[in-house]
């Protein structure tokens, strides 16, 4: 069931990412410029009807990978880490669990709104390594895949 929902989400989100210059491949979108590559991925749970929304930032200057994927990114996190409060995060977990609660279309619409209002501005505001290092939205608990040290070296 989660793969069917993932496909519906991909269709709804496609025009938003296309407008940002992202290219779609499978359940992922990516775009790159000289300094950063940005990724967004929809991941279906193997054990339930939950869906995860992964975000990644890759520092191009490292040239570690020619075509980086979300797993290669130096900064990786889930979209709920962009939410402002514990209540918003709890509500998002309920939205992304398609085993219960609101009907599927209502959940998809709410998830689309969160992505438009939280992730799209994040991608729009973060275009350089300096933007990432100086951002209040980038939290210490987000997963840095050796990225913090690299970013600091690249920025200096």
Give names to the regions the model predicted.
Residues 21-29:
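Short, well-structured beta-strand/strand-turn elements
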Residues 17:
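Pyridoxal 5′-phosphate
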Residues 1-8, 12, 31-156:
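Intrinsically disordered, low-complexity regulatory regions enriched in serine/threonine/proline
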């Amino acid at each position: 069931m989660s793969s069917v929902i993932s496909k519906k989400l991909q269709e709804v989100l496609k025009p938003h990412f296309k407008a940002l210059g992202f290219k779609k491949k499978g359940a992922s979108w990516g775009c790159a410029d000289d300094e950063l590559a940005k990724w967004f991925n929809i991941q279906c749970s193997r054990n339930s009807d939950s869906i995860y929304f992964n975000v990644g930032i890759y520092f191009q200057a490292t040239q570690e990978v020619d075509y980086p994927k979300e797993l290669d990114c130096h900064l990786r996190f889930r979209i709920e880490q962009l939410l402002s409060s514990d209540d918003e995060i709890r509500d998002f977990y309920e939205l992304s669990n398609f085993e219960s609660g609101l009907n599927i279309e209502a959940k998809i619409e709410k998830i689309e709104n969160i992505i438009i209002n939280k992730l799209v501005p994040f991608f729009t505001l973060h275009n350089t390594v300096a933007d990432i290092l100086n951002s209040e939205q980038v939290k210490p608990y987000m997963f840095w895949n050796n990225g913090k040290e690299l970013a600091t070296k690249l920025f200096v």
